[in-house]
Amino acid sequence: VTDPRTIPSPNIWHWPEIYEAENLAQDIDGNIPRYLRAAVPWDGRVVVDVGCGTGFHLPDFAADASRVIGVEPHEPLRAAAAMRVAGLDHVEVVAGHAESLPLPDSSVDLVHARTAYFFGVGAGPGITEALRVLAPGGSLVVVDLDVSASPYGDWMRADLPKYNCSAVEAFFEAQGFALTRVDTRWEFSNRRTMREVLGIEFTRSTAARAARSIPGLDFDVRYRVHVRRKPAGIELA
């Protein structure tokens, strides 16, 4: 059962099949996992994916991690994630929220969240909770869209005119995160799928304008990757 306090994520909640196609199209060149493996390697370590949805990223972590835990509050997505990793004995999917992870203190090495919960101001309780479950020397990684970069950011700002990119980045900086921008490319197999994906991410008018502006089957999308490490020892001023 989904906790009634959970804030819906309308795209993946209502159109999981289209969102799966979106996941398959995103970062087709693998730039984000390439960066993450260099910045926060998880070989032989314990990884938690907060807001894992249908578990799309769990197998990637499972290839090298000793244990992977997907945390997802929405029951239908949780069931889909569990089905996806059914053959992986060291992967489990559990119910939970970013603000109340069902894990012991200092029990994991990497907490990962991609376009989930950690959107800026208001994410403080989740950051505190992540630091609780992280072992000393572990890392919290937040991956989100860079709304300042064209063309995807232009479409987002059209639908979210009050979104303040600078304020969001300042929030994470104040919380002790280091920021890296990662350029990626989304590529689709056909224009129908591309239009469907744009249709679940934007208003009808913005999605139509975006589709008209794309001559082919791909476009650039930049991400922000915020990393905060938990000190391995006493943190001196």
Task: Identify what each model region corresponds to.
Residues 99-111:
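A short acidic, Gly/Pro-enriched loop at the edge of an enzyme's catalytic core
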Residues 48, 53-100:
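Class I SAM-dependent methyltransferase SAM/SAH-binding core
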Residues 109-123:
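A short SAM/SAH-binding and catalytic strip from SAM-dependent methyltransferases
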Residues 124-136:
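A short glycine-rich, Lys/Arg-flanked "PGG" loop and its adjoining helix->strand segment in the class I
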